[in-house]
């Protein structure tokens, strides 16, 4: 007998829901059944973010730093890229603050990738489409073409390793706790960043110390993003195939809480076993090397 020669088996959201209902001893019949299954599946994905690192959700981000002058530099950046589409960006200056004429919202310019776009820091306030923007140091003006989306930034779960690149050479940065960053006496010191603080708000940010001393250094880091939502039933899940059994088992357990309480115990046990097996496989196969670090040691 010949083998199939294919290795592309997958389940769309509708098939995942059908399998989960069948494990509960039920059948998916109505539109509400499909809707409640998708809702439970999205809650399951949120729970996975709380269980630890899912390697397929790790993304590499490269961000250029921004400095306006020897006394003004951007130290806090979005974890990802916020792009502002405008009528013209040429006359604005990297590092300066822009203000919305109607909303009074503010943000700092990080880069100007094209003649009609700027990347900015997390806005303070909400910019309004078509309003006039004014630069604080250049006095340049332009019009905001469309509303700004923060969805990519808000999908960040956490940040992993961070480095700063200068002249092709990378240096690893050390992470500060909220208390350690607060204890820094002079947060306005400029230099090559050596440390960073991640503020895990709904719109998370990363703050560097010392503040960047130029607009050419690059910050390179890995961020952990959210698993994409289970929206349309024809979509497939944002997971590797190894997690298909785990996803189905987890959804079956979540549905049993609502529809088949007599099966909660056994379905929960199956789910926990499937998740542990998948999570154990979802790791990096590297040699263990322990290196002591004294960069953040403080003697009191």
Where is each model-derived feature located?
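Autoprocessing Asn-cyclization modules and mimics
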Residues: 52-148
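Glycine-enriched, solvent-exposed interface loops adjoining structured elements
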Residues: 1-81, 143-300
């Amino acid at each position: 007998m010949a083998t199939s020669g294919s290795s592309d088996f997958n389940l769309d959201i509708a098939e995942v829901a059908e399998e989960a209902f069948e494990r509960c001893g039920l059948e998916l019949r109505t539109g509400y059944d499909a809707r409640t299954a998708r809702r439970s599946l999205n809650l399951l994905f949120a729970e996975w973010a709380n269980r630890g690192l899912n390697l397929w959700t790790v993304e590499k981000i490269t961000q250029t730093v921004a400095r306006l002058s020897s006394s003004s530099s951007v130290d806090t950046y979005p974890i990802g890229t916020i792009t502002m589409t405008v009528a013209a960006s040429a006359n604005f200056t990297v590092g300066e603050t822009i203000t919305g004429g109607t909303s009074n919202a503010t943000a700092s310019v990080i880069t100007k990738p094209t003649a009609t776009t700027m990347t900015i820091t997390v806005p303070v306030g909400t910019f309004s489409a078509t309003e006039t923007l004014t630069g604080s140091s250049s006095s340049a003006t332009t019009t905001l073409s469309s509303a700004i989306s923060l969805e990519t930034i808000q999908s960040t779960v956490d940040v992993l390793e961070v480095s700063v690149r200068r002249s092709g050479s990378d240096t690893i940065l050390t992470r500060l706790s909220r208390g350690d960053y607060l204890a820094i006496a002079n947060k306005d010191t400029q230099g090559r960043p050596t440390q960073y603080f991640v503020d895990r708000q709904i719109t998370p940010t990363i703050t560097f110390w010392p503040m960047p001393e130029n607009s050419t250094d690059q910050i390179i880091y890995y961020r952990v993003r959210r698993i994409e939502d289970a929206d349309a039933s024809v979509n497939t899940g944002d997971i590797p195939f190894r997690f298909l059994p785990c996803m189905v088992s987890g959804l079956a357990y979540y549905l049993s809480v609502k529809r088949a309480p007599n099966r909660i115990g056994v379905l929960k046990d199956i789910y926990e076993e499937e998740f542990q097996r998948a999570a154990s496989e979802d790791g990096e196969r590297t040699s263990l090397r322990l290196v002591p670090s004294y960069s953040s040691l403080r003697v009191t």
